[in-house]
Amino acid sequence: MDRTYVFLCIACEFKGGAFLRQLKRLGHTVFLVSSEKNKNEAWPYDDIEEAFFMPEKDGRKWDINLLIAGTAHLFRTHKIDRVIALDDYDVWKGARLREEFQIPGMGETTARHFFDKLSMRIEARDAGIPIPGFTALFNDDTIREFLKKSKGPWLAKPRRDAGSLNIRKIADADAFWHWSEETGDTRHQYLLEEFRPGIICHVDSLNYNDETLFTRASQYLDAPFEVAHGGGIFHSKTMSTKDALSKKLVNLNMKVLAAFGLRHGASHSEYIVRDGGKEILFLETSARCGGAHLTDMVEAASGISLWTEWANIEHAVLTGKKYHLPMVDELQAGIIVTLCKPEKPDYETFTDPEIWWKLHKKYHIGFIFQHKTEKKIDELLSRYTKVIQE
């Protein structure tokens, strides 16, 4: 029988239940650290040895020294074998803990490629991966040169914020310098990037021993930036694995993950597709499963639970056993999620057999559809969008 290993899992947001459950099924001891606000969420407490909650409400602003001190206290009685970061904002915390306690896994330098948008762009540029023009915001002369050579508008992006959070659109050079004054001493925490409109696609993957074993490309029907800043309905749909654009995205994604140094685990990456797929630009990546229930959509299409398989990969790495990816389905799926006025929407009138999943969250309504054809998924997303808007 394999020995029991100890996992310390960090999740500033409520997520990763399937990962925690699978580790327990495999015989491991699981400790969880989350934010105090998540204490009453439906964590799989029966599978967790002990849960600890940080006092800060904002997971981006945990006291790292308190986290280190708490980990040191736990380490006195439990030899921690792995630290796993389940959310974007946990990647740097996990790396810091690994460095502090000399635990194997991704260190702080490599981790920056997966949470620091500036580091991502520098790494991509140096690897010859196509990206929008960008500049760090350290030196005024460098910025002036970039503004002179580059064509606006631009996006000022926080280096450490996930997705589209706190991104500011900058129309011209004067607007940039006005924003720079507003930002003050925190300007270095941002980067400036050319705004390159296009279709935003995402690629969800599993890596094992430096090899990408599973990948599924999907397309947002509304750019996340527009949804985050203008409200509206969140949509995405998977792409056929036989689609030419999907194949291009998969190949580019493999190059990105190899260049960035992801050895094992899950990743969620985003790309800008322009000119009908003739140009694909890298946007960002991460060393964790995708959010917004995109993992559920991928599972509906492929039969692969990214959270579960990530746990299986961690188990294989620790025990020295070879990991085998389960059989992959070739179906299509789509997701639609938005806010609604009722606290608990009435789902009884939605009876289409293609409904694979329903969202149960206060003041939200959402569905995942599953079918063998992309055409049917498109039809369902269009029809349900109209119904929800009414």
Language-model regions, residue ranges each:
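Short beta->alpha connector loops
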Residues: 10-15, 35-36, 89, 137-141, ...
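Short beta-strand-to-turn element immediately C-terminal to the catalytic PLP-Schiff-base lysine
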Residues: 137, 167-172, 206-208, 369-370
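Conserved ATP-binding module of the ATP-grasp superfamily
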Residues: 130-132, 153-156, 165-202, 218, ...
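A conserved helix-loop-beta module that forms one wall/lid of the active-site cleft
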Residues: 99-166
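Peripheral (often C-terminal) accessory segments that flank ATP-dependent C-N-forming ligase machineries
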Residues: 143, 308-390
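ATP-dependent carboxylate/phosphate-activation module, predominantly the ATP-grasp catalytic core
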Residues: 174, 194-262, 266, 273, ...
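Glycine-rich phosphate-binding loop signature in dinucleotide/nucleotide-binding domains
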Residues: 73-80, 148-150, 185-186
